[in-house]
């Protein structure tokens, strides 16, 4: 009877899940230390033929004499966030927002991003207390489909309204972007990235469609940033300079923060060593909207 009870307890325990995080060495951001690092590296090379996966041969890498965990994990970013524009905080309202695709994603920060398209937008919507309400009334939001304008006397070219607010606990915003994808007359898929609003009242270059450098820098020794660069909010109205009303296309918004230290750099600083040389030392956290599709018919 005692053995039976013990067996049942083991079965129940095995069905439960636990969650833990790896150490900096296991994440691959700092090297293994001492003889354990050398043993791990050469043992992995010696027995790599036992692993059928190509990734098995790269589980550990040697850089400047130091042994790091390899594989794809060190190149990954940290966890992101899913954001929903729902009318209220209820299961039904949130589900409806998912159904109409009025959702966006971030790489981790709590950035707020709005994206609309329509034919009757004007500059007053950027500052009016009813601006977002008017955008819903006269256009479509992220995740929606914009049809060709058939109203006589109005422009065939849609206007896009984009607003973003920074996470107050993170870096300021650097730029707003719109990414356009389309299929040309020959059936080829195309894509182009437009900078549409720049921090610190800088102007987008009309030829390159890029914001100038706003001077944001990161001190790799301490991960300190210069908070006087960047903006807490960015907002603009934008029209596609190459818009073709006959082409099917999609547009989505993206907002980038000023550069900050990547998680692997933070690990290295806390360990009192230099960051791993083959990984990016900084990252620009960001948010992406769901796309708005244009149907030219």
Place the predicted regions along the sequence by residue.
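C-terminal functional module detector
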Residues: 12, 19, 40, 44, ...
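Divalent metal-dependent hydrolysis catalytic cores, especially in the metallo-beta-lactamase
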Residues: 13-43
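Single conserved hydrophobic/aromatic residue that forms the stacking wall/gate
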Residues: 1-14
């Amino acid at each position: 009877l005692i053995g039976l009870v013990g067996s049942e307890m083991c079965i129940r325990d095995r069905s439960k899940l636990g969650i833990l995080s790896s150490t900096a060495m296991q994440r691959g951001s700092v090297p293994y230390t001492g003889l354990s690092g050398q043993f791990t590296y050469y043992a992995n090379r010696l027995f790599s033929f036992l692993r059928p996966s190509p990734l098995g041969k790269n589980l550990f890498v040697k850089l400047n004499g130091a042994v790091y965990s390899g594989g794809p994990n060190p190149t990954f970013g940290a966890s992101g966030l899913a954001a929903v524009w729902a009318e209220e905080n209820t299961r039904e309202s949130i589900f409806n927002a998912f159904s109409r695709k009025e959702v966006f994603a971030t790489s981790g920060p709590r950035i707020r991003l709005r994206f609309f398209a329509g034919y009757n937008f004007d500059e007053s919507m950027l500052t009016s207390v009813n601006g977002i309400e008017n955008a819903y009334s006269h256009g479509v939001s992220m995740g929606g489909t914009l049809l060709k304008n058939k109203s006589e006397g109005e422009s065939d070219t849609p206007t896009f309204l984009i607003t973003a607010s920074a996470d107050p606990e993170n870096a300021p915003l650097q730029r707003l972007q719109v990414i356009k994808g389309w299929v040309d007359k020959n059936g080829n898929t195309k894509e182009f990235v437009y900078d549409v609003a720049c921090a610190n009242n800088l102007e987008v270059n009309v030829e390159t469609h890029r914001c100038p450098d706003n001077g944001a820098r990161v001190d790799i020794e301490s991960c300190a940033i210069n908070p006087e660069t960047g903006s807490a909010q960015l907002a603009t109205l934008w029209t596609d300079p190459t818009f073709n009303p006959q082409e099917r296309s999609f547009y989505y918004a993206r907002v980038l923060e000023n550069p900050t230290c990547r998680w692997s750099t933070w690990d290295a600083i806390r360990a009192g060593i230099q960051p791993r040389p083959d990984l990016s030392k900084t990252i620009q956290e960001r948010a992406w909207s769901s796309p708005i599709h244009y149907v030219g018919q």
